[in-house]
Curated annotation (Swiss-Prot):
Its main location: cytoplasm. The keyword Cell membrane does not apply. It is found in: Cytoplasm. HAMAP family: AcetylCoA_CT_alpha. It comes from Salmonella typhimurium (strain LT2 / SGSC1412 / ATCC 700720). One of its GO terms (cellular component) is acetyl-CoA carboxylase complex. InterPro entries: Acetyl_CoA_COase_a_su, ClpP/crotonase-like_dom_sf, COA_CT_C. This is Acetyl-coenzyme A carboxylase carboxyl transferase subunit alpha. It is an enzyme of class 2 (transferase). It comes from the Bacteria. Changing residue 229 to T: Resistance to thailandamide. Pathway: Lipid metabolism; malonyl-CoA biosynthesis; malonyl-CoA from acetyl-CoA: step 1/1. The lineage of its organism: Bacteria, Pseudomonadati, Pseudomonadota, Gammaproteobacteria, Enterobacterales. The gene is accA. Residues 35-296 form the CoA carboxyltransferase C-terminal domain. Component of the acetyl coenzyme A carboxylase (ACC) complex. First, biotin carboxylase catalyzes the carboxylation of biotin on its carrier protein (BCCP) and then the CO(2) group is transferred by the carboxyltransferase to acetyl-CoA to form malonyl-CoA.
Length: 319
């Protein structure tokens, strides 16, 4: 799969284009006198060095672009790479099956767990079918149904957050979008099983929070978590979405800032260039963090789990 480079990655893109051209020439004529392999190796080293330099000094807006990268791994990619025997479950048993939320039972190193996550979709038809990862009320009600099932069978719950926000359409509001989100917040705080939440891309507002109340909250290195998108904030404060980069910096949407504010527990490092550069390595790091979190939570009693979760929620907003 050819990489899709963002605007700030254009110097890297130019180097990679040269590498591809030289590689293509080498394949066409293996009898060339010049040593193309040596030049390709030199350019690859230069590309890695340049990538490292650019990614060492990313701003919040650049991180937001990475969090939305079209090739970034989604929930089902991590399910495939980090879990076994996934059995998807569908429907909220009240209205419909919302494809923007996926969930089901899987095994993590042999242990049954309940997985719930946003799913955006890749191709145009799938994006539309999954509503670009923006759940309707039935999506959140499906998520809650699966959480309650996990509680009945004493299975840990693992959620993956990646949404621009809950769907704001008229139909969603008529079917009780705000009530569905509020109910999830309340019920997740009361669950008797461990809950681990990880932001893998965009963590957009209440749409993210509705599956984001947990005992452990993690973020991938180049993910974001905020009450509104940078464009939305800029449109309100400056009446122009063009001010989105300024808004992104002001809102503190990136993982280091959120960890500093004690809103998250861990930052999971991404491969050089972002998770989309090496999904397998990213999935391995994510899996290791989940196993570590489960080991920490397994030693706690049900009362301790719930008390810690409550204290965590009550601490939000205090310096």
């Amino acid at each position: 799969m050819s990489l899709n480079f963002l605007d700030f990655e254009q110097p890297i893109a130019e180097l990679e284009a040269k590498i591809d051209s030289l590689t293509a020439v080498s394949r066409q004529d293996e009898k060339l006198d010049i040593n193309i392999d040596e030049e390709v190796h030199r350019l690859r080293e230069k590309s890695v060095e340049l990538t490292r330099k650019i990614f060492a000094d990313l701003g919040a807006w650049q991180v937001a672009q990475l969090a939305r990268h079209p090739q970034r791994p989604y929930t089902l990619d991590y399910v495939r790479l980090a879990f076994d025997e996934f059995d998807e479950l569908a429907g909220d048993r009240a209205y419909a099956d919302d494809k923007a939320i996926v969930g089901g039972i899987a095994r993590l190193e042999g242990r049954p767990v309940m997985i719930i996550g946003h799913q955006k979709g890749r191709e145009t038809k799938e994006k539309i079918r999954r509503n670009f990862g923006m759940p309707a009320p039935e999506g959140y009600r499906k998520a809650l149904r699966l959480m309650e099932m996990a509680e009945r069978f004493n299975m840990p719950i693992i959620t993956f957050i990646d949404t621009p926000g809950a769907y704001p359409g008229v139909g969603a509001e008529e079917r009780g979008q705000s009530e569905a989100i509020a109910r999830n917040l309340r019920e997740m705080s009361r669950l008797n099983v461990p809950v681990i939440c990880t932001v893998i891309g965009e963590g957009g507002s209440g749409g993210a929070l509705a599956i984001g109340v947990g005992d452990k909250v993690n973020m991938l290195q180049y993910s974001t978590y905020s009450v509104i998108s940078p464009e939305g904030c800029a449109s309100i404060l400056w009446k122009s979405a063009d001010k989105a980069p300024l808004a992104a910096e002001a809102m503190g949407i990136i993982a280091p800032r959120l960890k500093e504010l004690k809103l998250i527990d861990s930052i999971i490092p991404e491969p050089l260039g972002g998770a989309h550069r090496n999904p397998e390595a990213m999935a391995a790091s994510l899996k290791a963090q989940l196993l570590e979190d489960l080991a920490d939570l397994d030693v706690l009693s049900t009362d301790d789990l719930k008390n810690r979760r409550y204290q965590r929620l009550m601490s939000y907003g205090y310096a």
